[in-house]
Amino acid sequence: MQSHIRAFVLDKDRKPLMPCHAAKARKLLKKGKAAVFRRFPFTIILKERTREASAIQDVLVKVDPGSKSTGLAVVRKDEKNVHHALAFICLNHRGSKIRDALTSRRQLRRGRRSRNLRYRAPRFLNRKKPKGWLAPSLQHRVDAVMSWMNRLTRLVPVAGFVQELVKFDTQLMQNAAISGVEY
């Protein structure tokens, strides 16, 4: 997990304010006007200032999902609708590690069940998955992104979320002349 650019700021009531530059955060800490609230993502809490006395702009959290990693960008919009990046976070997913651990468990379980045990009733596929079930590696990806989105709403005055939805035709990218039955 990596984070860049700004320090998150909370007021004395732990309500989120606009992120500030790292140098400004250092000056506030040195003067005693702020204290370190959290080390990652680096967050300071102001000792005197409140949200009402601060200028707050609209902040968006942009999500770029991927199979191995997901990118989160905290951006603010100015008057001309130009986005300025405040922070970048890269979440590296553990999907392949989860899959490997489940494969190992499955192999051990099948080894136990294939032993020659007499007088045991045979097992059949008698288990149904609940509605909305996702594979554990995919569920981890969803849970990790959702937990970071919730965490960012506590650290930044978020006005909305934007998710990049992209579909790629990988067969067409490999072979431009593909058509019909070849698909």
Placement of each model-derived feature along the sequence:
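Positively charged, helix-rich recognition surfaces that bind polyanionic ligands
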Residues: 3-26, 30-33, 37-56, 65-70, ...
